[in-house]
């Protein structure tokens, strides 16, 4: 049977199931959760909505609404403990944009789902969860000149589970973020039109381990162990000057997790 979701723009499934009666995450089984968003309707002043629904019960777990919304992106943490909703909003003039984040804590579905909010006054170009941890990072500002990267934690026993910003990595030519599968190590990259600027960052120690360049790099991939990172210039499957441009630099490089060439 179809699920009614008028005007839905995007939906994403949770990466795991949940115990909706007692709380907690179930890696094998449990109730999956569907998240989706629908845009606002100016003709009848209906705001944009983000909704979480338990399937197959079709129980609405949480709904939030926002006005003056241009775009929404849904980011599930790989372990399913959190859902980050990135909301690009405009002011009444529609000339100025800013970003709101709504972070859903998913561990206690048997209670009301807690949602944390914060605002970034500039447009965010990319958001990424740490795969094996409780941190996230995002890029904002003009990445073609000098953008910034903010690193947050969702909290642990050391700070009583409080979400807080850890620090800002300032003035980086970057438009993509690539976490190691094991967490902690992060590649801050400027791909495509930024021509392959690479910085290997140690999140725990808040320090840059290495700055490198792979000219015209447009793809980055970590090996599953998190020990090796591969950067590549991949030729688009098309004809014309764009394809020829990448063909001249086609190839790959391997780096240690610290950013040393292999």
What are these regions (language model features)?
Residues 28-43, 86-99, 141, 232-250:
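Short, conserved, GDST-rich strand-edge loop motifs in beta-rich repeat architectures
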Residues 5-27, 69-80, 116-135, 168-182, ...:
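Conserved beta-propeller blade repeats
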Residues 48-56, 98-109, 150-156, 198-202, ...:
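Beta-propeller blade signature
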Residues 172-203, 207, 211-240, 244:
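Loop/turn-rich, solvent-exposed surfaces of beta-rich toroidal or solenoidal domains
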Residues 34, 80-83, 136, 183-186, ...:
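Hydrophobic beta-strand positions that form the internal "hydrophobic ladder"
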Residues 50-56, 63-65, 73-74, 78-86, ...:
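Extended repeat-based solenoid scaffolds, especially LRR ectodomains
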Residues 79-81, 85-88, 106, 132, ...:
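Short amphipathic alpha-helices and their capping/turn residues within compact interaction modules
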Residues 1-10, 55-70, 106-123, 155-173, ...:
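Multi-bladed beta-propeller domains
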């Amino acid at each position: 049977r179809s699920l009614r979701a008028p005007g839905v723009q995007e939906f994403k499934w949770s990466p795991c199931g949940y115990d909706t009666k007692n709380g907690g995450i179930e890696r094998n089984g449990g109730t999956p959760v569907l998240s989706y968003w629908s845009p606002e309707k100016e003709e009848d002043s209906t705001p944009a909505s983000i909704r979480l629904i338990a399937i197959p019960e079709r129980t609405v777990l949480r709904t939030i609404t926002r006005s003056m919304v241009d775009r929404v992106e849904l980011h599930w943490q790989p372990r399913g403990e959190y859902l980050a909703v990135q909301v690009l909003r405009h002011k009444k003039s529609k000339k100025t944009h800013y970003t709101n984040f709504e972070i859903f804590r998913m561990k206690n579905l048997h209670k009301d789902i807690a949602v944390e909010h914060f605002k970034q006054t500039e447009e965010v170009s990319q958001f990424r969860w740490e795969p094996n941890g409780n941190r996230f990072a995002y890029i904002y500002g003009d990445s073609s000149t000098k953008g910034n990267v903010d690193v947050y934690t969702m909290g642990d026993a050391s700070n009583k589970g409080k979400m807080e910003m850890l620090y800002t990595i300032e003035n980086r030519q970057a438009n993509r973020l690539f976490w190691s599968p094991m967490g902690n190590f992060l590649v801050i990259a400027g791909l495509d039109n930024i021509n392959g600027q690479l910085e290997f960052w140690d999140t725990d120690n808040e320090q840059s381990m290495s700055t490198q360049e792979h000219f015209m790099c447009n793809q980055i991939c970590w090996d599953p162990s998190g020990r090796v990172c591969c950067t590549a210039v991949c030729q688009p499957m098309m004809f014309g000057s764009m394809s020829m441009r990448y063909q001249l630099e086609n190839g790959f490089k391997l780096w240690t997790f610290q950013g040393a060439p292999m």
